[in-house]
Amino acid sequence: MSKRDYYDVLGVNRDASDDDIKKAYRKLAMKYHPDRNPDSKEAEDKFKEVKEAYEILSDSQKRGAYDQFGHAGVDPQAGMGGGGQGFGGFGDFADIFSDIFGGGRGGSGGGRSNVYRGADLRYNMEITLEEAARGCEKQIRIPSHESCSTCNGTGAKPGTQPKTCATCGGHGQVRMSQGFFSIQQTCPTCHGTGKQITDPCGSCHGAGQKKTTKTLNVKIPAGVDEGDRIRLGGEGEPGQNGGPAGDLYVVTHIKQHAVFQRDGMDLHCEMPISFSTAALGGEVEIPTLDGMAKVKISPETQSGRVYRLRGKGVKAVRGAEYGDLHCHVVVETPVKLTERQKELLREFEAISQGDVATHNPRSKSFMDKLRDFFE
């Protein structure tokens, strides 16, 4: 049986924010929770489906893989809770209800401190169109945290050890009842660590971490576009209680270019030409990302005509193909004419007999007569 689309399961759009996804999950989790629907196999199945969808879409890395490859891009078992958690495998539901009833983030029990993955970080990077097209390497500095070297991250004064929390017995969670619900929430005394620091470290004041700034080199691949994300694994916030660090996502923003407008792999630009070149044809030079290039202009060219230079666009991020450069003709009206130029134009106007130019290049028009005149 094929799985439903995770966005459809939660009833949200594909561009839904993290908050929208969490709100949708809260609502559906409360609606289908087994405690509210005893002996209902359908509600239980719905609850499992909602939970699985949330665990994928609430994780930025899994969500990205799902958006790109669908169900095949994520672990088929992702989001299906194991034993040992509150509600027989529905641990995330306990986390949501802990938020509702005032608790912090929960975790699994089992007589050990909770282990948390570090938070993901986002860095907005502005680059030029040339840098985006060719690729580049940038150095960035980001605020971060590092383990305290004085206490080795324990938060306790050197020579002492944290004590087992008396409130939760070292589990990091306490059980509470709210009406007909019985849920687990993070211990308010130790905040989920299962330990109490009675003699804190003087360097980090018991936090186990210190604020710092780190410098990273980021390789920008050729072909990146506006809003693309580059993942730097393990460069986010450090985890808690031995948990893994989060990731850093560098989001690219392309500066507006003075000449080119980008459309995916293709580039567009205006190509001004004189009205005599438009009528008679000729050759003009235009800028590209690789330098100047010559374009042969056909006779009777009208404003708005587009000349395409194949392979002069932006390289694909994956693969070796390139986009094209589309040059949009703009026929320029001459200014600051000499008396001789004005005389020639008056003569041309006279032999034109007041005919009005047409934009159909196949008809005998203004452009035809202009070409005949100059020839």
Swiss-Prot record:
Taxonomically, which superkingdom? Bacteria
Q: Which residues bind Zn(2+) 2?
A: C165, C168, C187, C190
GO MF entries: ATP binding; heat shock protein binding; unfolded protein binding; zinc ion binding
Its subcellular locations are:
Cytoplasm
Q: Where are the CXXCXGXG motif repeats?
A: 148-155, 165-172, 187-194, 201-208
Please name the SUPFAM superfamilies in this protein's record: Chaperone J-domain, DnaJ/Hsp40 cysteine-rich domain, HSP40/DnaJ peptide-binding domain
Among Pfam families, the record links this protein to:
DnaJ, DnaJ_C, DnaJ_CXXCXGXG
What are the recorded Gene Ontology BP terms? chaperone cofactor-dependent protein refolding; DNA replication; protein refolding; response to heat
Where's the J domain? 5-70
GO terms for CC? cytoplasm
This protein's UniProt keywords = Chaperone, Cytoplasm, DNA replication, Metal-binding, Repeat, Stress response, Zinc, Zinc-finger
Predominantly, its location class is cytoplasm
Chain ranges of zinc fingers (CR-type): 135-213
Q: Does the keyword Lipoprotein apply?
A: no
Q: What is written in the cofactor note of this entry?
A: Binds 2 Zn(2+) ions per monomer.
In this chain, Zn(2+) 1 is annotated as bound at C148, C151, C201, C204
Q: Which cofactor does it need?
A: Zn(2+)
Write out the function statement from the record.
Participates actively in the response to hyperosmotic and heat shock by preventing the aggregation of stress-denatured proteins and by disaggregating proteins, also in an autonomous, DnaK-independent fashion. Unfolded proteins bind initially to DnaJ; upon interaction with the DnaJ-bound protein, DnaK hydrolyzes its bound ATP, resulting in the formation of a stable complex. GrpE releases ADP from DnaK; ATP binding to DnaK triggers the release of the substrate protein, thus completing the reaction cycle.
Outline the subunit composition: Homodimer.
Question: What PANTHER family does the record tag this protein with?
Answer: CHAPERONE PROTEIN DNAJ (PTHR43096:SF48), DNAJ HOMOLOG 1, MITOCHONDRIAL-RELATED (PTHR43096)
State the domain notes. The J domain is necessary and sufficient to stimulate DnaK ATPase activity. Zinc center 1 plays an important role in the autonomous, DnaK-independent chaperone activity of DnaJ. Zinc center 2 is essential for interaction with DnaK and for DnaJ activity.
- Similarity comment: family membership: Belongs to the DnaJ family.
Protein's UniProt name = Chaperone protein DnaJ
The organism is Chromobacterium violaceum (strain ATCC 12472 / DSM 30191 / JCM 1249 / CCUG 213 / NBRC 12614 / NCIMB 9131 / NCTC 9757 / MK)
